[in-house]
Each structure stands twice: as C-alpha cells, then as structure tokens.
Amino acid sequence: MSAAKNEMYYSLLEWFKTLNLNAPHADAESLADGVAVAQALNQFAPESFTDSWLAKIKASAVGINWRLRMSNLKKVTQSLYDYYSEVLNYTLSDFVKPDVQRIAEKCDLVELERLLQLVLGCAVNCAKKQSYITEIMCLEEELQANIMRALQELESSRNAAEGGIVTSLSRSSISGMLDGKVLQEERDAMAQKCFETEKKMLLLIDEKTNLQQELQRVQKEFARLEHSSTVIGDDGVSLGPVQTGSVRYNELRRQLDLLKEELLQSEGAREDLKLKAQQQETDLWHMQMRIDELLKSTAEVTTLKDEVDVLRESNDKLKICEGQLDTYKKKLEDYNDLKKQVKILEERSADYVQQNAQFEEDAKRYANTKGQIELFKKEIQDLHTKLDSESSKNVKLEFDNKNLEGKNLALQRAKDSLLKERDNLRETVDELKCGHLSSNSGLTGTTVSRELQPPATVEKMQRLEAENKALREGQGGQTALAQLLDDANKRCENLREQLKTANERILSLSHASQSDDPILKESEFGKQIKQLMELNEQKTLQLEESVTQSSSLQCKVTQLETNLTAREQEVMAYDAKYRKCLEKAKEVIKSFDPRIASAIDASALEKYFDVVEEEPKPKMSVMEEQLMTSAFYRLGVNAQRDAVDSKLAILMGSGQTFLARQRQSAPRKSLSAMKSK
C-alpha cells in the first residue's frame, strides 16, 4: 500500500534525476536540504530564480542541522508560490502547501511529492518547456502517466474562476505536445524504414541489371555455340556441338532454370517492396496531415492562451472596477444620508432661529419685570423671616399652654382625690358621732380594747397605719411624677414638631440650593446650614437627655406602682384582720356594757384619725424637680439632634461631590453611645 501511495513520488523523482544539476538529487535525503530544488528552479527560470537568490540557499545545510534545511525549504516554497502567483498567474488556494518542517526532520515522501509537483509545474510552464516535455516523453509509459496525473492535480487546484477554461486548455496543450512528439518519432522511424527499403530496392535493381546482363551474355554464348560446330573448352578440348540430351545442354538448361527462379524471386521481392513503399508513403502522408492538424491545434491553443491572459487581465480590471463601484455606492449612500442630515439640521436651525427670536422678545419683556421680581423676593424673604419668628413664638406659646394644661389636669386630679377623701372622712365622722360616749369612757374603752389586744398585733397595726400614711403621701408624689412625665412627653412632642419644621426648612433650602446656581449655593446657604446644624446638635442633645430622664422616670413610676399595689394588698389584708379583731373587742365590750362599748369605739377612732392627720407628709424636694426638668429637656434635644442628623445625612450624602461631603461637619455621637463606651 505504501508503494502504491508513493508511486507518484518515485515517478517525479525519476524525472528529477534526468535534470543536469551539480547538487546530488538521487534520493529523498539529498532533496531534503533544498539545494538541488533551488538549482533546478534556477535552471528553469533564471530571470525569476536569479543567481543572487540561489546564493542565499546555504549548501552547508546537508548535514545534521535540520533547522538550516528548513530555512532553505521555506525560501524555496515561498519563491515557488510567488512565481506561480506573479509570473504564471496561478492561485494555488486548493493546493496543500508542503510542510517544510516534516521534510527537513523526517524526509517525508508525501510532502516531497507536493514540492516536486510544484517544481514540475515550473518546468512545464517555463520558457524551455518544449525540451523538458520531450524529456518527459522519453520516459516509460507508467512514469509518463504518473507525471500526467501530477500535472492534472496541480491544474485542478487552481482557482474556481479560472478552473474550467484553463484546465481544459492546459490539458489539451499538454496532450497535443505529447502526441506531436509521438508522431514525430513515428515519422522518423518510417523515414528510416523508407530509406532502408530504397537502399534494398537499389541493390535489387543493380542485381537485376547484372542478372539481365548475365542472361544476355549467356544467350549470346548459347547462340554462338549453336551456330558453331565445335566448342573448345578451357583446356583446349573440343566439347562438341550443343545438342539436346547432351551433357552440356543439360547443364546449361539447369543454369537457365536457376537464373529464372532467381529472377522471379527478385521480381516478387521488388513488388513487395513497392507495396511497402506505397503503404509507407500513405502512412507518411497521414502522419503529415495529423502533424499539420496538431500544429493548427497548438496555434489555436496559443491564441486561446493569449485570449485567456487577456480575459484574466480584464477579469482583474473588472474586480477592481467592481470594488470601486461598491465604494462609490457606499459613498453615494453616505452622501444621501448627509443630505438628509443637512436638511434636518437646516430645519432645526430655522426652528432655533425662531426660538431665539422669541427668547429675545421674552427677554425684553421680562427685563422690565426683573426689578419688581427682586423687590417681591426681598419682601418674601422678610415675610419668611417674620413667619419663622412668629412660628417659633407660636410653638413656645403652645408649649407653655400645654404645660399649663398639664398642671391644670394635675390640680384637677388632686382636687378630685381630696374631695373623695373628704367624703370618706365625713362618712367616718358621722359613724363615730353616733356613739355619743364621753371622753373618759372612751379612754377606758380604748384602754380596755388595747389591753384586750396582744402587744404584737398592736405594734403591727401601728406600723401598718404609718406605712399606709406614707403610701398615701407617696401616691401624691407619684401623681406629681406622672404629671412631670406627661410634661416631659409634651415637651418631647413639641421638640419633635420643631424638629419637623426645621427639617422641612432644611429640605426647602436644599431644594432651592439644587435649583439655583452652584456658586450661590455655598455663599447663600452655607451660613444657614451651619446654623441649622448647630441648632440641630443642641436640640438632639436636649432630646437625648430628656429621653434618658423620661425612661428613668418611667422605670421609677413602674416600680412605685408595683410597690403600691403590693402594699395596698397587704393593707387590705391587715385591715380585714384589724376589723375582725375590732369586732371581737366590741363584742367583748358589749358583753360588759353596750353603752360603754360604743363610746369607746367612737372616741378611739376620732383620736386615731386626728393622729393620722397630724403626722407630717413627705414632699418632693426642689432639687429633684430641677433634675427631672433638665433630664426631660436633654432627652428632647438629643432626639431632635438625631433626627436632624439623619435627614441631613440623607440629603447631603446624595448628589454631592466628594469634596463637598468632606467640607461638611460630621454629626456628633449620641450621649447614650458615649456613655456606653
């Protein structure tokens, strides 16, 4: 299989061996350095493959250094492709380019076959192509068939646009040249045969004339012998007359027959030679006619080649013209687009001119009203300042009103509690006055009732009564704390309202600053923003303090409420026990005397309530009230500051540059965060 595949390579190698080259070119290793191929190309087309180009091919690459061989082969293949494209106008787009690296490293036969195909194409298409074609025709028929197949593959790899006409012309030209060579050889052979037959004919004609002369001589001798009576032989002996039946007659007859046979044979050979000469003349005439036809076909092929060259040039010019036509079409489309854009721009410019005229008229109109607008702006600013002052006064008055309302509510609650206590005391006094006992009996009754009770219960009762008084007084303080808490909550709400108004004002100022010129932004609103930031910090500090104080007060209130409920439950339990004991004492006293018992009970209760009322009530100190109010104000200020800081961070953080954000003051940390740290 490998031999069948490489059959074309060996055929091309046999043809390459016929070239007269200085470098060795007998095998694949000698061809792998590229020197022999370069010499062959220089021999084929010295005007393209010049001596200076041949000098660049290094002959020292025959050794082990395959990189030098690869560089030589690269130069050879590149020059071959340039020759095909520039000189022969071949486009070898479908032909696989030989891999020079595989040739240099491994002496690959397939790649060498492709390289030798390109070299064969150069030899067939060069100026001395007739001599190389005749050398190819002198090879064996198998080699000629393989070489013809290699040329057909090379021709089939040409460009598709040139494929149909050029391949047929090239094949017909090659086949015509090969047939012409065969006919020339046949004509030479026939001419040689004709020359030999003519020589034979001349020899036979000479021999015929000699035989005729000999025959005439023999006939003359025979006639002489017939007329003479005696015949003398060579030895001088008389042979006697020639008579039929004699020995001499028989011998002469035999010689005559032999001569006749030879004459007939010579005449037959002459006729055969004449026929052969005529046949060869007819063949020679047919060959001459065929040669004339082939010469005409070669002339037609050359004319067709010239026409193909003209068509190729016209095709190239047509391609160039088509490219120019495409560019002109694109330019025309761009020109049309530019025309449309120019029309649109003209329309826009006309609209802009009209708008500018209208704007100029409007500017003339508004120039008169500009002074009035500035006056109105100043008046509006004054009115805004007055409105701000009035709103702040209104807020203060609302805050004072709310404080007074809180105090009024606290006083109303205290009044209601006092009225309830008064009603309860009246009921108890009425019950006590029903006894009508004297003070002495009352004293004895009380002493008796106290004597009847154990001392532990008496002490416990006294302690519970004191705690009850303290809790009642603490309840009054608790109401005061609740009032303070309400006041603090109201103040916090007022501060939140002020914070809301301040935030709205900040938003309006920021909106105005965004809509106005950025140069006026820093000059007009910088001071106002700084003032608002300072006010915001103060308010937030106050709000934080008030929040912390309100939370602490709320915790205290809840603790006091829980303690109060627990104490009330204990008081209720002890009161029930006390009433049971008191009823038992009353029953005991009634068992002694019912009148004394009622008097003792009423007098004892009156004294007990007098003692309870005379005890001093604990009051809240002034310092505690001041601390509560200051804590409440701090709480409100801190809350306001936190709210303003958050809104300012939202407003100033978006839509500003890095430098503008760096100029702003960072918001202060809350008091609670500082305390936690």
Swiss-Prot record:
Recorded GO molecular functions are: dynein light intermediate chain binding; microtubule binding; small GTPase binding
Question: Looking at the keywords, is Methyltransferase present?
Answer: no
The record's annotation in SUPFAM superfamilies points to: Hook domain (SSF116907)
Q: Which GO terms describe its biological process?
A: cytoplasmic microtubule organization; cytoskeleton-dependent intracellular transport; determination of adult lifespan; endocytosis
Principal subcellular localisation of the protein: cytoplasm
What's in the keyword line of the UniProt record? Coiled coil, Cytoplasm, Cytoskeleton, Developmental protein, Endocytosis, Endosome, Microtubule, Synapse
In Swiss-Prot or TrEMBL terms, this protein is called Protein hook
Q: Whose protein is this, by species? A: Drosophila persimilis
